[in-house]
């Protein structure tokens, strides 16, 4: 296969080289013709027409090109013979055999794979396989129980705290509700995470006697000069006429450039959103909130969502998404079934964008994530599975729109965060 590819490449290269020689030769002829014409005119000899000069020069150069013609012919003959050579034929035969062989091997591997899958399934369902799994599960349980005293030692806890530096949640994982609460309390106690602080709106309103005289800002002075003086109004009118309203192409281009440069330094929508959250809570930062989303808020909400925990979701959801979810749960309740899903893994928790919602410019953060989950619904009376499968793992995408209520920042659970929109996107079977 490689050899035939080389042969085809060699033929293509020879044709390319031939075209290159011809192109270089033609350029050389034209250059010499022009040079001869300019030389004749400069010397002031017998005037000859440009056509005569071109004909004579071309004839002389063509006579000198026998070597070039022979090289071109040699290359063409070599490329033609190469295609008919024994090496070329052998390489092509080897290539075709390799193709046929790969097809046969592919079919054989597929058949072998199906056979192995059948054998593995039978082994898994056999009595020996079932007994082995039970023994392994019992052994794992005993090991877990025997290791529990080690987990309670001071050294183990200190090592665990050092290893968990707050970045492990970035790469996925999921811990239980109790573990989340304990970790949150531990982080607050150790100072890794600060409690939300409600801004004091009354701060700074007390009257303080000082000797400092109030000074008018420079910008205010400029505005007063433009609006209240004759000279200022004249300058402003001249600026509008010569700059703002001018249709001169040069002025239009310069105006666009200054607008672009000014836009670089303008405050973006995202910075305005973060500034508003910073005013509500001086301890707020993008990095700390993203970590809090990964470690506590998103796992808390998604677990409640797949388990049908209406009480937890009512704390986090605003009225609109909560009413939608409550209506769904009401239908399940009427059918005497309840949700008993599980979250296995959460990853990709990121703040996608920051927006100001019109018309009141409400600051919001759009958060996205992916979760591996099992959706189950059980009968209330017997606990039997009514819908779903414990072995069916789904990969689902979620999107949430967060805002913050300044009046509830001191809430120990939510710290004022509310979900305005909650969307469960597409789900596919995880394999």
UniProtKB/Swiss-Prot annotation:
It is found in: Mitochondrion inner membrane. ATP binds at residues 101-108. Pfam families: Tim44. It is a peripheral membrane protein. InterPro entries: NTF2-like_dom_sf (IPR032710), Tim44 (IPR017303), Tim44-like (IPR039544), Tim44-like_dom (IPR007379). GO terms for molecular function: ATP binding; protein-folding chaperone binding; protein-macromolecule adaptor activity. GO terms for biological process: intracellular protein transport; protein import into mitochondrial matrix. It comes from the Eukaryota. Gene3D superfamilies: 3.10.450.240. Residues 43-209 are annotated as: Interaction with SSC1. Keywords: ATP-binding, Membrane, Mitochondrion, Mitochondrion inner membrane, Nucleotide-binding, Protein transport, Transit peptide, Translocation, Transport. GO terms for cellular component: extrinsic component of mitochondrial inner membrane; mitochondrial inner membrane; mitochondrion; PAM complex, Tim23 associated import motor; TIM23 mitochondrial import inner membrane translocase complex. Component of the PAM complex, at least composed of SSC1 (mtHsp70), MGE1, TIM44, PAM16/TIM16, PAM17 and PAM18/TIM14. Forms part of the receptor complex that consists of at least 3 different proteins (TIM17, TIM23, TIM44). Essential component of the PAM complex, a complex required for the translocation of transit peptide-containing proteins from the inner membrane into the mitochondrial matrix in an ATP-dependent manner. Recruits mitochondrial HSP70 and its co-chaperone (MGE1) to drive protein translocation into the matrix using ATP as an energy source. Belongs to the Tim44 family. This is Mitochondrial import inner membrane translocase subunit TIM44. It comes from Saccharomyces cerevisiae (strain ATCC 204508 / S288c). The lineage of its organism: Eukaryota, Fungi, Dikarya, Ascomycota, Saccharomycotina.
């Amino acid at each position: 296969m490689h050899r035939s590819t080389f042969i085809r490449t060699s033929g293509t290269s020879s044709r390319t080289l031939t075209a290159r020689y011809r192109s270089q030769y033609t350029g050389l002829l034209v250059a010499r013709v022009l040079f001869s014409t300019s030389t004749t005119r400069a010397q002031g000899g017998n005037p000859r027409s440009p056509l005569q000069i071109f004909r004579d020069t071309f004839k002389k150069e063509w006579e000198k090109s026998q070597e070039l013609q022979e090289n071109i012919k040699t290359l063409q003959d070599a490329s033609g013979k190469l295609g008919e050579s024994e090496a070329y034929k052998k390489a092509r035969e080897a290539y075709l055999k390799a193709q046929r062989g790969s097809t046969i091997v592919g079919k054989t591997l597929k058949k072998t794979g199906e056979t192995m899958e059948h054998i593995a399934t039978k082994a898994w369902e056999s009595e020996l396989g079932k007994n082995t799994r039970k023994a392994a599960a019992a052994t794992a349980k005993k090991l877990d129980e025997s290791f529990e005293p080690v987990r309670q030692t001071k050294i183990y806890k200190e090592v665990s705290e050092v290893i968990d530096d707050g970045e492990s949640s970035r790469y996925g994982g999921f811990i239980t509700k109790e573990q989340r609460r304990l970790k949150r309390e531990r982080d607050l106690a150790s100072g890794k995470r600060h409690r939300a602080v409600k801004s004091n709106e009354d701060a700074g309103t007390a009257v303080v006697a000082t000797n400092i005289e109030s000074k008018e800002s420079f910008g205010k002075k400029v505005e007063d000069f433009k609006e209240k003086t004759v000279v200022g109004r004249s300058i402003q009118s001249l600026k509008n006429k010569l700059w703002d309203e001018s249709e001169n192409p040069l002025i239009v281009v310069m105006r666009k450039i200054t607008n672009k440069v000014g836009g670089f330094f303008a405050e973006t929508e995202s910075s305005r959103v973060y500034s508003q959250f910073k005013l509500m809570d001086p301890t707020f930062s993008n990095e700390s909130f993203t970590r809090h989303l990964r470690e506590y808020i998103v796992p808390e909400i998604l677990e409640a969502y797949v388990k049908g925990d209406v009480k937890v979701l009512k704390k986090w959801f605003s009225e609109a998404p909560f009413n939608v979810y409550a209506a769904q749960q009401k239908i399940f309740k009427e059918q005497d079934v309840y949700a008993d899903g599980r979250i296995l893994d959460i990853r990709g928790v990121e703040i996608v964008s920051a927006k100001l919602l019109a018309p009141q410019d409400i600051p919001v953060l759009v958060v996205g994530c992916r979760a591996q989950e099992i959706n189950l619904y059980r009968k209330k009376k017997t606990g039997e599975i009514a819908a779903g499968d414990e072995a069916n793992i789904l990969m689902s995408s979620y999107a949430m729109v967060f805002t913050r209520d300044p009046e509830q920042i001191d809430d120990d659970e939510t710290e004022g965060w509310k979900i305005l929109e909650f969307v469960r996107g597409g789900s596919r079977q995880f394999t």
